[in-house]
Amino acid sequence: ADKAAVDSMRSELNNLEMKGQIVIGEGELDEAPMLYIGEKLGTNNGPEFDIAVDPLEGTNFAANNLPGALSVIAVAEKNSLFNAPETYMEKISTKITEKNVIDLDYTVKQNISNLSDYLNKKPEELTACILDRPRHKEIIEELKKLKVNLKLITDGDVSGALLVTDEKYNVDIFLGIGGGPEGVLAASALDAFNCNFQCRFLFKTEKDKERAKKI
């Protein structure tokens, strides 16, 4: 499924009148044969663009014929998309754009309290979306203590962040730790929806720090 998505996306991008370059893709040149970081795409005529892609987010969804898989592309002017390294990021997304309501520096309890006050909802009327991962155990336990409704997702770092964009999804906040490249893709989409997305790197090892310094 992933190969089919890569092949199709690359073929279509190469048909566009542009000078495109992958800044977030399937990996470095030695890691991926196509849609690798630095690969040139397009007809080599027209405007210059940075391109960030995730040809298939939610591979397991697609493989099992389940809803939730996405093909994600962000295109922007040259030198305007951040080439995020393959490291973890702390993330929060909401529809609230006012300052000092939701912040990565706040505790989960403080963010939920602020969200509750701002939306005029009780904590038990709020819904938080988070990836169902062992690394989120403490956050999930805290949300349960606060009686916040949980939407646990098995995959979909980008799609999870986008659930705050429309009331039909009934998600007030997305939070947790996910991939850096996925953070850039989510930020690009959420900006178009005039939503609030905050992220910062969470380096687990010295190797992660060194990788980030090279970007």
Regions found by a protein language model. Name each.
Residues 34-36, 64-66, 84-87, 139-144, ...:
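Short acidic, glycine/serine/threonine-rich loops at helix termini
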Residues 46-57, 61-82:
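DPxDG-like acidic metal-binding loop motif
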Residues 14-15, 40-46, 54, 62-66, ...:
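Solvent-exposed alpha-helices and their adjacent loops that cap or buttress functional pockets
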Residues 22-26, 51-53, 62-64, 83-84, ...:
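General beta-strand structural signal in soluble alpha/beta enzymes
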Residues 1-52, 110-113, 117, 144, ...:
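N-terminal subdomain of lithium-sensitive/metallo-dependent phosphomonoesterases centered on the IMPase/IPPase/PAP
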Residues 163-215:
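Oxyanion/phosphate-interacting regions
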Residues 72-153, 215:
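Acidic beta-strand-loop-alpha-helix segment within the catalytic core
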